[in-house]
Amino acid sequence: MFHKILSTLITVLTFFVVSTTAAQRPSPTPPTSHAQDEPITEDLSYGAMFKFTIAPDLPEFTFKVTPEPQKPDEYGNSHTTVRNVQVFRGDSKQPMQSLEDCEWEGMEAPPRGSDWFRAEDMNFDGYNDIYVLINWGATGNELGCVWLYDPKSSHFVFSKEFSELGRLTLNPATKTIATHSNGGMAGTIFRATKYVIEDNRPVPVVTVAQDFDFDKREYHCVVQQRRAGENALVTVRDGWAKPKGDFDAPCDASDPFRSIGDK
C-alpha cells in the first residue's frame, strides 16, 4: 500500500514539474517581415558628402550637405532634408560657394538608395552640372533643383528653367532632354515634352499631352511640334478616341515620341 501511494505521489509531482516548465518556457517569436521594417527614405540626419568630376581638366569637387533635422514618422522613415550645400574645389578646406536659390523648405526626404544628388551634363556643354531631387511621389513625378557649371566664373549657377523640367531623361547623342509627367489612370493621362538647348536654356520642340474626358468617355491627345524655321509650336495632331479596352489610349505613354519625326 505504501509503495502504491509513493508511486502515485511521484507521478503527480513529475506532471506538476513538467507542466510548470512548459508554462514558463517563452512562446516562439512569430516571424517578422524585414521588408516592412526597411525605411523608404534616405536618412540625412548626419548630413552627406558627394565627390564629382565636373570636367577632365578640373580638380574634383566635394559637396557637403548640412541637414535640416526633422522627426521621423511613425514607421521610422526619416524626414530630415537639406539646409545647405557647401561646395569645395580640389583639396581646399574653405568652401568656394554654397548652392543657392533652391527652396529647401519645401523639400521632401529623398527615396532610400536613389540617385537624388548627382552630377550630369544637363546643357551638353562638356561640364557636369548638379541635380538635387526635391519632390517625388508614387506616380513617378519628380521635381529637382539644377545648378549649371559656369566655366567662366568656375561656379555653379542655379537655373530656374532647368529646375522646372520635372522628371527628365538626358540623351547626349541627340543633345535633347525628354520630360514626362503622370496624370493618373495607369499613366495614360500624361504630358511628355522634348527639349533642345538654345542660349543655355531648354526649348521645347515636341509636346504630347493626353487627357481623358469623363463626360465623353474618350481620350484626347494633342501633339505639337516646332517646324523648321519657326519658334512656336504648332499642332500636328488633335485626336479623340474611345478606349477599346482598359486604358487603351491613342497616344502611347511608354513611348510618346514614337510616331513623331526627328525622334
Predicted regions and their residues:
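Bacterial N-terminal signal peptides
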Residues: S7-V17
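Blade-edge motifs of beta-propeller repeat domains
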Residues: R83-P110, S153-T169, T176-A178, V206
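Acidic/hydrophobic-patterned starts of short beta strands in beta-sheet-rich repeat architectures
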Residues: F61-V65, D121-I134, K175-H180
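Short glycine/acidic-enriched loop and turn motifs that connect beta-strands
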Residues: W136-T139, G184-A186
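Acidic, small-residue rich beta-repeat scaffolds with periodic aromatic anchors
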Residues: S19-N84, T176-K263
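Beta-propeller blade repeat segments, especially FG-GAP/WD-type strand-to-loop junctions
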Residues: F88-D91, N141-F158, K194-D199
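Beta-propeller blade termini
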Residues: M49-T53, R112-M122, L165-T176
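Positively charged n-region of N-terminal signal peptides that target proteins for export
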Residues: M1-I5
